[in-house]
């Protein structure tokens, strides 16, 4: 190789040497190989699939978009609620125009307020200012005050109070009880100025009136007076006015103690003619024993008296 190189240098020093086509091709191939090796120096082939991927891709990207959209919707709802509260409470540069908050826990409304349901806290008080009325109005609906099972309903045509234990009305200044249904401690009295009491059903031990006034019980339909251990009616004069029938029922006996008067003005009378010829009517005669016991005797003929063996008077007849 050294001799060939020396010969080549000797030939080249004498002048250009003509090379064959084969030698030129080999020389060109060697030059290109050397050039390519120099171009790829420091180059390392990298597989992109094996690289660490950064950012949110695939399902994580979709989840991130959903979270962002949800936060945006919540922000819009929060903005709407804030605007509504701002418009209702009327918050301005000088504070709240519709209400005041005090350090003692008092909440004061400075204008007409529209509310649905109010839930006061434990031992809370709802009231008005001094020398001013507290006006509570329901829009075509009753106003209901309720605490547990006790309820006060104020409607357009009536006011109803519902309670399991009872109720009391007292003067807030003097603390005097004006009206109470605690029969064990206070006797039931109608308030001053109240002339009548309208109830559907009343359960009590005794019903009395003043010594100078009458006790009137009036009903539009049917009145039922019932006692678990008997019914006692006492008075200077007792009158029953009925448009229909009066029925007295007792397990043991009915005692009428006093002067008993039966007005026959409204009793039906038979028409003239044959009074005992037809079978459509059954007639009775009202009789009384010496002790005041009333009984009836069926009338079967004319001029019939109360003499019958079947009577509660014993051997009197």
Curated annotation (Swiss-Prot):
The entry assigns this protein to a family as follows: Belongs to the sarcoglycan beta/delta/gamma/zeta family.
Q: Which InterPro entries match?
A: Sarcoglycan, Sgcb
TM helices/strands, residue ranges: 65-85
**Biased composition range(s): Basic and acidic residues:** 20-31
Q: Which cysteine-cysteine pairs are annotated as disulfide bonds in the entry? A: 287-313, 289-306
Annotated region Disordered: where? 1-31
The protein's name is Beta-sarcoglycan
**Protein's membrane topology:** Single-pass type II membrane protein
State which residues carry a glycan (glycosylated). Answer: 157, 210, 257
One GO CC term, this protein? cytoskeleton
Cell compartment(s), UniProt: Cell membrane, Sarcolemma; Cytoplasm, Cytoskeleton
Instruction: Describe the processing and modification events after translation.
Output: Disulfide bonds are present.
Question: Which regions face the Cytoplasmic side of the membrane?
Answer: 1-64
């Amino acid at each position: 190789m050294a001799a060939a190189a020396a010969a080549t240098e000797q030939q080249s020093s004498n002048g250009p040497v003509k090379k064959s086509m084969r030698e030129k091709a080999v020389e060109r191939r060697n030059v290109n190989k050397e050039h390519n090796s120099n171009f790829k120096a420091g180059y390392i082939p990298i597989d992109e699939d094996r690289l660490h991927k950064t950012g949110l891709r695939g399902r994580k990207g979709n989840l991130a978009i959903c979270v962002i959209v949800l936060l945006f919707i919540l922000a819009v709802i929060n903005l709407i609620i804030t605007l509504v509260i701002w418009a209702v409470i009327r918050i301005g540069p000088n504070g709240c125009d519709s209400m005041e908050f005090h350090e003692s826990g008092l909440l004061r409304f400075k204008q007409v307020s529209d509310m649905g349901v109010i839930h006061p806290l434990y031992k809370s008080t709802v009231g008005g200012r001094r020398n001013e009325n507290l006006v509570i109005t329901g829009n075509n609906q009753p106003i209901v005050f309720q605490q547990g099972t006790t309820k006060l309903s104020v409607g357009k045509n009536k006011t109803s109070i519902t309670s399991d234990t009872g109720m009391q009305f007292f003067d807030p200044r003097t603390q005097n009880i004006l009206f109470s249904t605690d029969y064990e401690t206070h006797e039931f009295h109608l308030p001053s100025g109240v002339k009548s009491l309208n109830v559907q059903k009343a359960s009590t031990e005794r019903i009395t009136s003043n010594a100078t006034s009458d006790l009137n019980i009036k009903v539009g339909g049917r009145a039922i007076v019932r006692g678990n251990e008997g019914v006692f009616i006492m008075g200077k004069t007792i009158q029953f006015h009925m448009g229909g029938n009066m029925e007295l029922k007792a397990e043991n006996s009915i005692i009428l103690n006093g002067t008993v008067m039966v007005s026959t003005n409204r009793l039906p009378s038979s028409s003239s003619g044959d009074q005992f010829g037809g079978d459509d009517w059954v007639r009775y005669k009202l009789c009384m024993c010496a002790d005041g016991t009333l009984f009836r005797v069926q009338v079967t003929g004319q001029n019939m008296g109360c003499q019958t063996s079947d009577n509660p008077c014993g051997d009197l007849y």
